[in-house]
Design a protein with these regions (language model features):
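Extended, low-hydrophobicity, polar/charged segments
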Residues: 1-252
Length: 252
């Protein structure tokens, strides 16, 4: 309320209170005050039905899949010149929703590879992936002599030196196309549950325009732009525990 009164007295219009990621500050809960404007540097997910609002970095992505292609056996196929999802879909005549896209990062500490698999029509939310990994990461540089084959990376047969994550968007899809870890080669008929039975799903996707609201469940999310003009953090005992801060109460 204090922030809201300050903004009102300053004559700042349309300041939205949105859920956000705590980032470096830490703590379990944080909220940002966003001045809504088309030239804002941040993206905000807003539900016009129930009023839910969150920075896209913190907004859960809820995906409901429909199986339009029936389950098939895993099959290695030649796919020359298909290093992107668009080229692959055009070559095989399939929708991007039936592809498992590999997005590659490296840990800042040791440059080890992290591969996040996500439905081909969606994008990775780097904040969510950073939180899942538990340390800082950066987009990968894949050299010619790398253990990864750029443009054709897949979970079947991938090096055990690579940390692999599967986004929730792949759960329950019967038929997927994914890289075969060889140049100009993909697997068709890939099924996560069958072909990678130990896979664990994590929410890594960016919420999208028209996406499902995490609060009311309606597919009406709007993505707006905003400028952060305030931020509050619920730190709890994050810093007091880390620094072993204690005090003597009336009982000593």
């Amino acid at each position: 309320d204090a922030y809201s009164r300050i903004f009102a007295r300053c004559g700042i219009p349309e300041v939205a209170i949105v859920k956000s990621d705590s980032g470096m500050m830490g703590g379990s809960i944080s909220h940002e005050y966003m001045l809504l404007t088309p030239v804002g540097e941040d993206s905000i997910a807003i539900c016009p039905e129930c009023g839910y609002s969150a920075n896209v970095e913190a907004a859960p992505s809820i995906i409901k899949n429909e199986n339009k292609i029936p389950k098939e056996e895993l099959k290695e196929v030649s796919t020359p010149g298909t290093g992107t999802i668009e080229e692959l879909c055009d070559f095989l005549k399939i929708p991007a929703e039936n592809t498992a896209k590999a997005v590659v990062y490296q840990k800042n500490a040791d440059d080890s590879y992290i591969v996040a698999f996500i439905r081909g029509d969606l994008d990775i939310n780097e904040t969510k992936l950073t939180n899942a990994v538990g340390e800082d990461i950066h987009p990968a540089v894949i050299e010619d002599d790398s253990i990864l084959t750029a443009g054709f990376i897949g979970p079947v047969g991938i090096s055990d030196k690579v940390t692999v994550y599967f986004d929730n968007s792949l759960e329950g899809i019967d038929y997927l196309v994914t890289g075969a870890n060889k140049v100009d080669t993909h697997y068709t008929g890939f099924n996560v549950e069958r072909d990678c039975p130990d896979a664990k799903y994590v929410d890594l996707a960016k919420i999208t325009e028209g996406g499902i609201c995490p609060n009311c469940g309606k597919p009406v999310i709007n993505i707006s732009r905003g400028i952060e003009v305030g931020n509050i953090f619920q730190l709890g005992t994050k810093y007091s525990k880390a620094m072993n801060f204690t005090y003597a109460d009336e009982n000593g």
